[in-house]
Design a protein with these regions (language model features):
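A short, surface-exposed loop/turn module that caps and links secondary-structure elements
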Residues: 29-54
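Short, flexible helix/strand-to-coil boundary loops that buttress conserved ligand/catalytic motifs
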Residues: 16-17, 35, 88-89
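Active-site micro-motifs of SAM-dependent methyltransferase domains
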Residues: 11, 30, 80-83
Length: 99
């Protein structure tokens, strides 16, 4: 699959250290190499969304939108578990999903 990153995702990824940075790079490689989203480990579809998913990376959550036409994963957010389901993030994700 193809992979794209938002500025917010890149900024959060650069702040990671140690095992989280390694885990994130492994997860991104997994995303690039799987044939479809259903094959990803630690990945779940977000309730109430059509093409938005989250991947668990330790105590962090990576949220992405899967664009079926281009077979592209657009990583939008990388946040700690405590912030992950904040209404602001989910509202913004919903807007981006709709285009």
């Amino acid at each position: 699959m193809n992979v794209q990153y938002s500025k917010a995702f890149i900024k959060s990824a650069h702040k990671l250290t140690g095992k989280y940075k390694i885990a994130l790079s492994r997860k991104i490689e997994e995303v690039k190499n799987v044939p479809n989203v259903e094959k990803l480990t630690e990945c779940r579809k977000l309730e109430g969304f059509e093409n938005s998913f989250r991947i668990r990376i330790g105590s962090y959550r990576a949220f992405f939108i899967f664009v079926i036409v281009d077979n592209t994963v657009c990583f939008e957010y990388l946040v700690s578990r405590g912030e992950a389901y904040n209404k602001e993030y989910l509202k913004s994700l919903g807007k981006k999903e709709k285009g």
